[in-house]
């Protein structure tokens, strides 16, 4: 099906120009390549050849950084040795940090593991939840408010981060005002903290 969409023969092998890119296909089992001493080199060679066709340069890195939508998965290779860590720059919320801070640099060193929200991937006028240490559902954004339901494991703390252009007028949990020290607004991020419950909690942010 993929070859059909690309407009090439189904028995295609080798390297072929397709549109503005290059397709490389080798009839080798990925599982077999993973067990072969030469498997890694065969894959690297194929990728380098494809990149050369489009004027790209092969560059090795001591880290793997994958992006999907606003999310970044980052891992430092355990065998990277004394290499300089890869540093991501921007505006991120590291989801493995319970405090959900906003950081502008994130170092991916040897053995590091990170799951980040890239705030710069959201439209400049985006309003709403971008990270949460609970399950968020039924979110609704209007000119007057942001409302959503939250549910989580009992006896744990919920932390919810929202993009908001201005500090909120008031935040309520099940119609009761959230205490001031549980509400933090800085640099366009509203951070809420409240006890999780294993039942629906209604959160309302008045704008």
Predicted regions and their residues:
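Surface-exposed beta-strand/loop patches in extracellular or lumenal glycoproteins
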Residues: 78-90, 151-167
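A conserved amphipathic helix/loop scaffold
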Residues: 1-143
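Solvent-exposed beta-hairpin/edge-strand motifs
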Residues: 89-98, 162-177
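Beta-strand-rich recognition domains
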Residues: 137-162, 200
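Hydrophobic, well-ordered secondary-structure elements that form the walls
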Residues: 74, 148, 171
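Surface-exposed interaction regions enriched in Ser/Thr/Asp/Glu
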Residues: 189-207
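Beta-strand-rich interaction surfaces with strong enrichment in secreted/lumenal proteins
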Residues: 104-106, 137, 148-150, 190-194
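Short proline/glycine- and polar residue-rich coil/turn motifs
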Residues: 106-110, 182-186, 193-197
């Amino acid at each position: 099906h993929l070859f059909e969409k690309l407009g090439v023969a189904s028995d295609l092998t080798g390297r072929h120009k397709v549109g503005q890119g290059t397709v490389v296909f080798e009839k080798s089992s990925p599982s077999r390549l993973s067990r072969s001493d030469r498997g890694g080199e065969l894959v690297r060679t194929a990728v380098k050849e494809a990149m050369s066709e489009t004027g790209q340069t092969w560059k090795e890195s001591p880290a793997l950084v994958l992006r999907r939508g606003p999310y970044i998965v980052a891992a430092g290779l355990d065998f990277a040795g004394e290499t300089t860590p890869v540093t991501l720059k921007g505006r991120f919320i590291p989801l493995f940090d319970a405090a959900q801070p906003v950081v502008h640099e994130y170092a991916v060193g040897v053995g590091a593991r990170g799951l980040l929200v890239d705030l710069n991937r959201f439209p400049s006028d985006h309003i709403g939840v971008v990270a949460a240490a609970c399950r968020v559902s039924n979110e609704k954004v209007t000119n007057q408010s942001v409302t959503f339901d939250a549910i989580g494991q009992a006896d744990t703390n919920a932390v919810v981060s929202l993009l908001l252009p201005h500090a909120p007028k008031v935040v309520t949990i099940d119609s009761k005002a959230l205490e001031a020290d549980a509400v933090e607004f800085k640099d366009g991020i509203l951070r809420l903290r409240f006890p999780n419950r294993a039942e629906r909690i209604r959160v309302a942010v008045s704008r």
